[in-house]
Amino acid sequence: MTSRPLILGSSSIWRKQVLIDMGYIFKTMSPDIDEKAIRDSDPKTLTLLISRAKAQALLKRIKESDDELDKKSIMICSDQVIVHNGVIREKPETEQQCREYLQSYEFHPAVAVVSVVVVNIETGKIVEGTDIATQHFKKISDEFIDKLIKQGDVMHCAGGFTVEHMADFTLQLEGEVETILGLPKTLTKNLISQVSQ
């Protein structure tokens, strides 16, 4: 744990839940950057670049604000992509694309690549890292895919799926479920510890 206030640089309900489950008290701020303007063919590099951009956008906003507590905080920003059979997948752009994503996971697993950038705003210390987890699925029925898409959450998730809604179709998980959710628990805890010293 840290004695400094925490800021989660994300509006993701899944990242929020990971931090809550870890026992942290924090506030959230949305970076509001154009992630599509940042491109790289390597998933680790891409997620690091986007995480850094999120952190820089929020740092600028915090430094220009009058909130002294924010200026003494530790900020966490992360980004996630899913790699499927060597191809990077971000959030689906259409329902059809989401449907194709979900139908494909029975053939190749979903590999979550998540980068995290943690900043001690007061000292300026920045640390970062990347974690990977692989989720294997069995065939997901068309009826269930329709239900997921209608419900809507999957349209806001890298790779077009949410593990909490798909328990009946999940097989082996290699790595942390928190990585699949978008915020690796062990990595995040270690990075917070590093900037707290």
Curated annotation (Swiss-Prot):
Single biological process term from Gene Ontology: nucleotide metabolic process
Superkingdom as given in the UniProt entry: Eukaryota
Enzyme class per UniProt: hydrolase
Keywords assigned: Cytoplasm, Hydrolase, Nucleotide metabolism
Residues of the active site: D79 (proton acceptor)
Disulfide bonds: none
Function text: Nucleoside triphosphate pyrophosphatase that hydrolyzes 7-methyl-GTP (m(7)GTP). May have a dual role in cell division arrest and in preventing the incorporation of modified nucleotides into cellular nucleic acids.
Organism name: Dictyostelium discoideum (Social amoeba)
Protein's name in the database: 7-methyl-GTP pyrophosphatase
Family: Belongs to the Maf family. YceF subfamily.
EC number(s) recorded for this UniProt protein: 3.6.1.-
Molecular function GO labels: nucleoside triphosphate diphosphatase activity
Pfam families: Maf (PF02545)
Location within or outside the cell: Cytoplasm
A GO term from the CC aspect: cytoplasm
Principal location: cytoplasm
Annotated site residues (Important for substrate specificity) in this chain: W14, Q80, E164
Catalytic activity: N(7)-methyl-GTP + H2O = N(7)-methyl-GMP + diphosphate + H(+)
